[in-house]
Amino acid sequence: YCQKWMWTCDSERKCCEGMVCRLWCKKKLW
């Protein structure tokens, strides 16, 4: 499942974007 704080920018890891688990995510500048 996915949570708002589960952010990972890894091609092999899932990333949470809009409460949806994806296999990719855009790199974000904090």
Swiss-Prot record:
Q: What is the effect of changing R22Q?
A: Moderate decrease in ability to inhibit human Nav1.7/SCN9A
Result for mutant: W24A:
At least 10-fold decrease in affinity with Nav1.5/SCN5A
Q: Which terms are listed as keywords in the entry?
A: Calcium channel impairing toxin, Disulfide bond, Ion channel impairing toxin, Knottin, Lipid-binding, Neurotoxin, Pharmaceutical, Secreted, Toxin, Voltage-gated calcium channel impairing toxin, Voltage-gated sodium channel impairing toxin
What happens on changing R22 to D/E?
Important decrease in ability to inhibit human Nav1.7/SCN9A
Per the UniProt entry, the effect of L23A is:
No change in binding affinity with Nav1.5/SCN5A
Tell me what the record says results from W7Q.
Important increase in selectivity for Nav1.7/SCN9A; derivative JNJ63955918
Q: Which residues form a coiled coil?
A: none
Q: Outcome of mutating W5A, per the record?
A: At least 10-fold decrease in affinity with Nav1.5/SCN5A
Q: What name does the UniProt record give this protein? A: Beta/omega-theraphotoxin-Tp2a
Organism whose genome encodes this protein = Thrixopelma pruriens (Peruvian green velvet tarantula)
